[in-house]
Amino acid sequence: MIDLRNVEKTYYSNAGDIHALKKTNLHINAGEIFGIIGLSGAGKSTLIRCINMLEVPTGGQVFVDGQELTAMNNQELRKARQNIGMIFQHFNLLASRTVYDNIAFPLEIQGISQSEIKKRVQPLLELVQLQDRGDYYPSQLSGGQKQRVGIARALASDPKVLLCDEATSALDPQTTKSILDLLKDINKRLNLTIVMITHQMEVVKEVCDRVAVIENGEIIEEGSMIDVFTDPQKPTTKDFVKSINNIELPALLQSSSISAVYTEGSKLIVRLSFIGNSAGDPIVSGMVKKFDVDINIIYGNIDRLRIYPSAPWSLRFQEAPQVSKMLCNICMNSS
């Protein structure tokens, strides 16, 4: 659905050039929720604005739904943008217009008739659960309700892609969850491709199918949400993952699946990650019974990565031949 090929963005100034994006390549599949996470100034907002050409790349190509946006003239680009909705951290609603009229606004600009606008706006009000707020003004709404209006307005043109630029950053945790639940529902109902820019790993964990990590204008890591969470490769990614695990482990434990081998005297420390159905299986007690080993659990956590249960555990063993046999058995069963 979305392809970025060697996309670059440089801001030129007398004080010095800023290379916001450097040879960025990214493929986002149709119908998935794709997260782009990075620290402030990493280039993530520049990247998402290059997707709909709010920022014109200095170099490279941008394709959306098979069309090259970077090769279009202004008229062609205006038409192509109707397939790309966008919501922002700040809701950007028109204070003098009602909820209904805010949602209708992009359709009015396109010259669509009032009867057709009504057919589109009413279902959108129901979709974002504001069917009883159509006559309200933005000043009468909560932050979460304002963002729901923003989402409905972004969907008014029936786009294939929804870009979300820090859409939950200004919301409290409970409201954030309700907005993320809404986006997941919209993704399923409409088969909508959603791109989420965020600095919050909790957001990625909750909704994303795949994720890319951006740092200093470069994509440094990319993969499925499960892979990135359970096997982070880069220091920045590890810091993001650590921020939601709320624990500092020795460096040799910062890997996934099975990593044996932080030694502590005559003992081994092993880190195991159970994903999906295995997170609920009695694996640790099974190891004790089968291999007759003493296990000390030094860290354990049960979490959820979108729809998948996740359970990272760190275990301490007395070194013994049966421990090596046990670890080999785990590796064979997980491969």
Give the role of each language-model region.
Residues 67-68, 104, 108, 115-132:
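Conserved ABC ATPase "signature" region
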Residues 52:
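Helix-to-loop junction immediately C-terminal to a conserved catalytic motif
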Residues 204-206:
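A short, surface-exposed alpha-helical micro-motif characterized by mixed small hydrophobic
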